[in-house]
């Protein structure tokens, strides 16, 4: 047992060190050669020798670095939660069609809604409308998957159903592209080619806040998810409210998938 714990510490320590090294490499290395001492001066808030270097570090490398870290944490956490609930190591947001659902929500906003979400009470536009559309699309597919999981006992069949949902949403997106305007299709295609550099320094606080909220919910679910590893009946005997856990998982996974997809 002690040997196993030491092994885990070594693995986690190695991964943590690797993350730190990659963060440093991302900040100090790039297509533009910026001296290391200049990068340190920029990060400490001092004036750099060239104004363009300050722009590159703060507007490109730093947001890109934080976005990559948070996206990795969000996708791994959502995948772990789905694998635990469905008792299947292959379950994740892409295979179950949740990412496709988020993309469909964005397509409805950008291609059918003109980039805005309007109700009788409020109107959302810009990247906040994209986030809401992605969240609603991801949650809708996740609700459908959870409903199917109560009917389908085979995990393999459930994964196949998730793949089918993904193809259906992709077909609907293609249909929306066919009837949309050229400007709408262009905007959606540019968004669909997203990269870690798509989050600007101004958008980074909102992206970080939403991701951290989803991760905090995932942390709150650690104990009930550990109980679910032993089976739903055992978890219920331990006092775990499975329906409530699934609802929180629904919100956390939907939020994390929506944020990583929409930005």
Regions found by a protein language model. Give the residues of each.
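Alpha-helical transmembrane segments in inner-membrane proteins
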Residues: 1-263
